[in-house]
Protein backbone atom coordinates (compact mmCIF):
# COMPACT_ATOMS: atom_id res chain seq x y z
CA UNK A 1 0.00 0.00 0.00
CA UNK A 2 1.17 3.50 -0.85
CA UNK A 3 2.30 5.70 2.04
CA UNK A 4 3.46 9.31 1.98
CA UNK A 5 4.38 11.94 1.16
CA UNK A 6 7.73 11.31 2.83
CA UNK A 7 9.51 14.33 4.28
CA UNK A 8 12.60 15.05 6.35
CA UNK A 9 13.00 14.31 10.07
CA UNK A 10 12.94 16.89 12.86
CA UNK A 11 13.72 16.50 16.56
CA UNK A 12 10.14 17.07 17.72
CA UNK A 13 8.94 14.33 15.34
CA UNK A 14 11.30 11.90 17.08
CA UNK A 15 9.95 12.90 20.48
CA UNK A 16 6.35 12.39 19.37
CA UNK A 17 6.90 9.06 17.62
CA UNK A 18 9.12 7.44 20.27
CA UNK A 19 6.20 6.26 22.41
CA UNK A 20 4.96 4.14 19.47
CA UNK A 21 8.31 2.48 18.58
CA UNK A 22 7.36 2.57 14.87
CA UNK A 23 9.10 2.05 11.57
CA UNK A 24 10.12 5.60 10.72
CA UNK A 25 10.32 6.36 7.00
CA UNK A 26 11.97 9.67 6.20
CA UNK A 27 14.16 11.44 3.64
CA UNK A 28 16.82 13.70 5.11
CA UNK A 29 17.13 15.14 8.59
CA UNK A 30 18.41 18.13 10.53
CA UNK A 31 22.17 17.60 11.08
CA UNK A 32 23.37 20.02 13.77
CA UNK A 33 25.70 20.36 16.76
CA UNK A 34 22.73 21.21 18.99
CA UNK A 35 21.17 18.11 20.62
CA UNK A 36 17.85 19.97 20.75
CA UNK A 37 17.68 20.02 16.93
CA UNK A 38 20.06 17.23 15.83
CA UNK A 39 17.52 14.82 14.36
CA UNK A 40 20.19 13.00 12.29
CA UNK A 41 22.26 12.14 15.35
CA UNK A 42 19.34 11.44 17.65
CA UNK A 43 17.75 8.96 15.23
CA UNK A 44 20.80 6.78 15.95
CA UNK A 45 21.19 7.55 19.66
CA UNK A 46 17.49 6.82 20.27
CA UNK A 47 17.79 3.59 18.21
CA UNK A 48 14.80 4.54 16.05
CA UNK A 49 13.74 1.79 13.62
CA UNK A 50 14.58 3.92 10.61
CA UNK A 51 14.09 3.45 6.89
CA UNK A 52 16.02 6.33 5.35
CA UNK A 53 16.81 7.41 1.80
CA UNK A 54 18.91 4.45 0.63
CA UNK A 55 17.46 1.72 -1.56
CA UNK A 56 14.64 1.30 -4.05
CA UNK A 57 11.87 1.60 -1.47
CA UNK A 58 10.79 5.09 -2.54
CA UNK A 59 9.51 6.69 -5.71
CA UNK A 60 8.12 9.96 -7.02
CA UNK A 61 4.45 9.80 -7.90
CA UNK A 62 4.79 12.10 -10.96
CA UNK A 63 1.73 14.12 -9.96
CA UNK A 64 2.57 16.24 -6.94
CA UNK A 65 5.23 18.94 -6.83
CA UNK A 66 8.49 18.30 -4.97
CA UNK A 67 9.08 17.89 -2.10
CA UNK A 68 5.55 16.53 -1.65
CA UNK A 69 5.86 13.80 -4.29
CA UNK A 70 7.91 11.13 -2.53
CA UNK A 71 6.18 7.88 -1.53
CA UNK A 72 6.91 4.38 -0.35
CA UNK A 73 5.12 1.06 0.18
CA UNK A 74 4.03 -0.44 3.49
CA UNK A 75 4.73 -3.90 2.11
CA UNK A 76 8.30 -2.92 1.21
CA UNK A 77 8.73 -1.36 4.64
CA UNK A 78 7.58 -4.54 6.39
CA UNK A 79 9.93 -6.65 4.26
CA UNK A 80 12.81 -4.36 5.21
CA UNK A 81 11.79 -4.62 8.88
CA UNK A 82 11.74 -8.43 8.69
CA UNK A 83 15.25 -8.43 7.22
CA UNK A 84 16.42 -6.23 10.11
CA UNK A 85 14.74 -8.45 12.72
CA UNK A 86 12.16 -5.82 13.62
CA UNK A 87 9.30 -8.30 13.61
CA UNK A 88 7.79 -7.75 17.06
CA UNK A 89 4.81 -5.50 17.76
CA UNK A 90 5.37 -2.60 20.17
CA UNK A 91 3.46 -2.50 23.45
CA UNK A 92 1.32 0.63 23.06
CA UNK A 93 -0.98 2.00 25.74
CA UNK A 94 -4.10 3.18 23.95
CA UNK A 95 -5.87 6.46 24.48
CA UNK A 96 -9.43 6.19 25.75
CA UNK A 97 -12.25 6.42 23.21
CA UNK A 98 -15.95 6.89 23.86
CA UNK A 99 -18.98 6.44 21.65
CA UNK A 100 -20.27 9.39 19.64
CA UNK A 101 -22.66 11.68 21.47
CA UNK A 102 -26.27 11.38 20.37
CA UNK A 103 -27.50 14.12 18.03
CA UNK A 104 -29.43 15.80 20.87
CA UNK A 105 -26.25 16.01 22.94
CA UNK A 106 -24.02 17.47 20.23
CA UNK A 107 -22.89 21.08 20.38
CA UNK A 108 -23.10 24.00 17.97
CA UNK A 109 -19.46 25.12 17.85
CA UNK A 110 -19.16 24.75 14.09
CA UNK A 111 -15.87 26.46 13.10
CA UNK A 112 -12.29 26.10 14.27
CA UNK A 113 -9.80 28.46 12.60
CA UNK A 114 -6.05 28.03 13.10
CA UNK A 115 -3.78 30.81 11.86
CA UNK A 116 -0.08 30.32 11.21
CA UNK A 117 2.64 32.50 12.71
CA UNK A 118 2.49 36.10 11.50
CA UNK A 119 6.01 35.93 10.02
CA UNK A 120 4.69 33.74 7.18
CA UNK A 121 3.85 36.23 4.42
CA UNK A 122 1.62 33.94 2.38
CA UNK A 123 -1.82 35.56 2.74
CA UNK A 124 -3.11 32.65 4.80
CA UNK A 125 -2.26 29.94 2.27
CA UNK A 126 -1.56 27.46 5.09
CA UNK A 127 -4.21 28.58 7.57
CA UNK A 128 -6.45 25.70 8.61
CA UNK A 129 -10.22 25.72 9.12
CA UNK A 130 -12.20 22.81 10.53
CA UNK A 131 -15.96 22.87 10.01
CA UNK A 132 -18.16 20.74 12.26
CA UNK A 133 -21.00 18.74 10.72
CA UNK A 134 -23.56 17.75 13.34
CA UNK A 135 -25.00 14.91 11.23
CA UNK A 136 -21.72 13.01 10.90
CA UNK A 137 -20.30 14.39 14.17
CA UNK A 138 -17.08 15.15 12.30
CA UNK A 139 -14.78 18.11 11.60
CA UNK A 140 -13.86 18.69 7.92
CA UNK A 141 -10.64 20.47 7.02
CA UNK A 142 -9.86 23.33 4.65
CA UNK A 143 -6.37 24.73 3.96
CA UNK A 144 -6.06 28.29 2.69
CA UNK A 145 -9.82 28.45 2.19
CA UNK A 146 -9.97 25.30 0.01
CA UNK A 147 -11.24 21.86 0.96
CA UNK A 148 -8.38 19.50 1.78
CA UNK A 149 -8.97 16.46 -0.43
CA UNK A 150 -7.26 13.13 0.22
CA UNK A 151 -5.44 12.27 -3.02
CA UNK A 152 -6.02 8.52 -2.62
CA UNK A 153 -9.72 8.49 -1.66
CA UNK A 154 -10.80 11.78 -3.30
CA UNK A 155 -12.73 12.67 -0.14
CA UNK A 156 -12.36 15.64 2.18
CA UNK A 157 -10.07 15.08 5.16
CA UNK A 158 -12.01 14.88 8.44
CA UNK A 159 -11.65 13.85 12.06
CA UNK A 160 -13.89 13.05 15.01
CA UNK A 161 -11.56 14.59 17.59
CA UNK A 162 -9.48 17.74 17.19
CA UNK A 163 -6.78 18.77 19.68
CA UNK A 164 -4.84 22.03 19.76
CA UNK A 165 -1.74 21.29 21.84
CA UNK A 166 0.21 24.39 22.87
CA UNK A 167 3.98 23.99 23.31
CA UNK A 168 6.86 26.34 23.99
CA UNK A 169 8.56 27.59 20.84
CA UNK A 170 12.02 29.10 20.50
CA UNK A 171 14.45 29.70 17.62
CA UNK A 172 17.59 27.57 17.43
CA UNK A 173 19.57 30.55 16.09
CA UNK A 174 21.30 28.46 13.43
CA UNK A 175 21.93 29.10 9.74
CA UNK A 176 18.78 27.23 8.64
CA UNK A 177 16.30 29.02 10.88
CA UNK A 178 15.39 25.83 12.74
CA UNK A 179 13.07 25.91 15.72
CA UNK A 180 12.89 24.13 19.08
CA UNK A 181 9.52 22.83 20.27
CA UNK A 182 9.14 21.63 23.86
CA UNK A 183 7.13 18.41 23.60
CA UNK A 184 8.13 16.87 26.96
CA UNK A 185 6.48 18.28 30.07
CA UNK A 186 2.98 19.70 30.12
CA UNK A 187 0.98 22.58 28.71
CA UNK A 188 -2.41 23.90 27.68
CA UNK A 189 -4.68 21.90 25.39
CA UNK A 190 -8.02 22.68 23.76
CA UNK A 191 -10.33 19.88 22.57
CA UNK A 192 -13.06 19.99 19.94
CA UNK A 193 -15.27 16.91 20.30
CA UNK A 194 -18.99 16.40 19.59
CA UNK A 195 -19.35 20.03 18.51
CA UNK A 196 -18.22 21.26 21.92
CA UNK A 197 -15.09 22.94 23.27
CA UNK A 198 -13.22 21.64 26.32
CA UNK A 199 -9.98 22.96 27.78
CA UNK A 200 -7.36 21.19 29.85
CA UNK A 201 -3.73 20.17 29.62
CA UNK A 202 -1.44 17.69 27.89
CA UNK A 203 1.29 15.81 29.71
CA UNK A 204 4.31 13.82 28.46
CA UNK A 205 6.77 12.75 31.16
CA UNK A 206 9.59 11.47 28.92
CA UNK A 207 10.52 11.03 25.27
CA UNK A 208 9.23 7.44 25.21
CA UNK A 209 6.10 8.20 27.24
CA UNK A 210 2.78 8.67 25.48
CA UNK A 211 1.27 12.16 25.51
CA UNK A 212 -1.88 12.07 27.65
CA UNK A 213 -4.68 14.62 27.53
CA UNK A 214 -6.76 15.79 30.49
CA UNK A 215 -9.65 18.15 31.13
CA UNK A 216 -9.49 20.87 33.78
CA UNK A 217 -10.73 18.42 36.43
CA UNK A 218 -7.86 16.01 35.79
CA UNK A 219 -9.93 13.43 33.91
CA UNK A 220 -8.38 11.84 30.83
CA UNK A 221 -10.06 13.02 27.64
CA UNK A 222 -12.05 10.43 25.69
Question: Where do the PLM segments sit?
Answer:
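A surface/extracellular/periplasmic glyco- and lipid-processing/surface-interacting theme
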Residues: 2-222
